[in-house]
């Protein structure tokens, strides 16, 4: 039986770069119509593309941004709100927005990572918004492929070269600082922080909490659990209450953890805020908790619009210098906190038994 002829390998943008003797970024700039390429280099790229019968489809790239949610559930309320903001900006600029989800390990070499098929070159995608939980290896992969991207700076885990990338972030350190100062202004001194400091966002918020506690002359009280979401808050709070430690207020690292804090406090027979005041972070769960949760509001839709604006700008100018934008947060006060009377200085168990 005659062997079937092997199909020729598909030409990739890497082949164009190799034949032209230029970088992937240079080929990408030519493809997107950037004016930051010398005529000589542009000619070499176009000649190589013609020889390889490779279409540099710059037109299509100018109108589509990919929103990639990495290593997060697609129903995550925080990132869903960021997506809404990105959609609003893209609609205002007559730009398409494509939602993609991917999961990858932070320890996988970037050469072994696989992008969603539509991002393999040639692609109509002009730039990418990286939301969810990301790490340096994916940033290296996008850089190697010459794909312009903007990353949410708060959610990059591990060591990363922040100065090399365009990013939008919110000031979670200052947000946690404000929340802790607020609790102290109500008379609280036994203020615990609940979070998983293996994650950079929890660690930064702990830094803000610690700064406030030091300024007030109080020792930081940390219960650090390697968990996520509601389980994190629930297990950490159960542990605190089990020890009999004095606690009048808890700063939860995010609202999902705060939901677990509520559950543990209620199971132990205590009341919020009569026995323990609670503050969350992100302001995504307030309406579904009873009493409504005091939380640090992150302007998620503004973040989405800002990331989309940065990405849109880099479609036509992929060689722009990295830019980092920081958005402030806002403490939203609700019914989960109350002033602590100066006479209420006994440990929690003693206060409850005296009722």
Enumerate the language-model features and the residues they cover.
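N-terminal helix-turn-helix DNA-binding module of bacterial transcription factors
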Residues: 1-61, 354-355
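Alpha-helical recognition/docking segments in bacterial nutrient-uptake
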Residues: 1-8, 64-181, 241-242
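Flexible loop/turn connectors
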Residues: 6, 220-221, 236-355
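Residue-level detector of anion-binding/catalytic polar loops
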Residues: 23, 55, 91-96, 148, ...
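Alpha-helical structural signal in soluble globular domains
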Residues: 48, 85-89, 141, 204-216, ...
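Periplasmic-binding protein-like
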Residues: 67, 121-131, 190-195, 223-224, ...
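Hinge/beta->alpha junction and helix N-cap segments in small-molecule ligand-binding domains
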Residues: 70-81, 99-111, 154, 167-178, ...
């Amino acid at each position: 039986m005659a062997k079937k002829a092997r199909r020729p390998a598909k030409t990739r943008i890497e082949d164009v770069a190799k034949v032209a003797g230029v970088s992937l970024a240079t080929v990408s700039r030519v493809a997107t119509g950037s004016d930051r390429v010398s005529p000589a280099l542009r000619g070499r790229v176009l000649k190589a593309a013609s020889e390889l019968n490779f279409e540099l489809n710059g037109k299509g790239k100018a109108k589509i941004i990919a929103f990639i949610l990495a290593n997060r559930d697609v129903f995550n309320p925080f990132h869903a709100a960021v997506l809404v903001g990105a959609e609003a900006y893209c609609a205002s600029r007559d730009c398409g927005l494509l939602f993609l989800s991917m999961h990858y390990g932070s320890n996988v070499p970037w050469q072994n990572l696989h992008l969603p098929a539509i991002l393999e070159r040639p692609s109509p995608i002009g730039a990418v918004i990286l939301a969810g939980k990301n790490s340096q290896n994916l940033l290296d992969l996008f850089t190697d492929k010459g794909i312009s991207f903007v990353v949410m700076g708060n959610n990059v885990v591990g060591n990363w070269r922040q100065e090399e990338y365009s990013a939008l972030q919110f000031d979670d350190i200052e947000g946690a600082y404000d929340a802790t100062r607020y609790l102290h202004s109500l008379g609280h001194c036994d203020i615990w922080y609940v979070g998983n400091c293996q994650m950079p966002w929890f660690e930064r918020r702990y830094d803000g909490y610690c700064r406030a506690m030091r300024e007030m002359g109080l020792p930081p009280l940390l219960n650090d659990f390697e968990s996520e979401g509601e389980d994190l808050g629930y297990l950490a709070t159960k542990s605190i209450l089990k020890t009999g430690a004095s606690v009048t207020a808890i700063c939860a690292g995010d609202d999902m953890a705060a939901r677990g804090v509520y559950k543990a406090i209620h199971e132990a027979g205590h009341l919020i805020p009569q026995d323990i005041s609670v503050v969350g972070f992100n302001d995504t769960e307030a309406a579904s908790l009873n009493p409504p949760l005091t939380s640090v509001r992150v302007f998620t839709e503004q973040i989405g619009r800002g990331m989309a604006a940065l990405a849109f700008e880099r479609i036509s100018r992929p060689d722009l210098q990295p830019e980092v934008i920081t958005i402030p947060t806002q403490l939203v006060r609700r019914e989960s906190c109350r002033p602590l009377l100066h006479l209420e200085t006994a440990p929690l168990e003693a206060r409850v038994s005296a009722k």
